[in-house]
Amino acid sequence: MAFIDWDLAAPGARIHDIAHVCWQYLGLGPSVTDVDKAARRMRLIVDSYELPDPQRLVSTILWWQDRCWRGIETQADAGDLAMARLRDAGAVRQVQSAYQWVSDHRDALERSVQ
């Protein structure tokens, strides 16, 4: 058994948790130099957590990334100082780069979890 705690922890869909684990703990983004290794690690996570619908995993990772950068932008524009600091520090660009990387390697990542 494992417990995963996020800043905004709340009950939610299991696939959302697993997608977030893959994104954050595997560092899915431009710093990954070995796509096959990242894909194997995704498979290990899927198997370890017995994810029943792994075919949706990569699209859910992309959903999280899109939601994250858009949320930072929206909240920063609305005057949230913490989100403005994140944006100013380059967090939006980092998440967008991660999104692009996952999109670029989507086929390999999806094959690994099927």
Q: Which stretches of residues belong to each language-model region?
A:
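Active-site activation/catalytic loop segments of kinase-like enzymes and analogous catalytic loops
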Residues: 18-50, 65-74
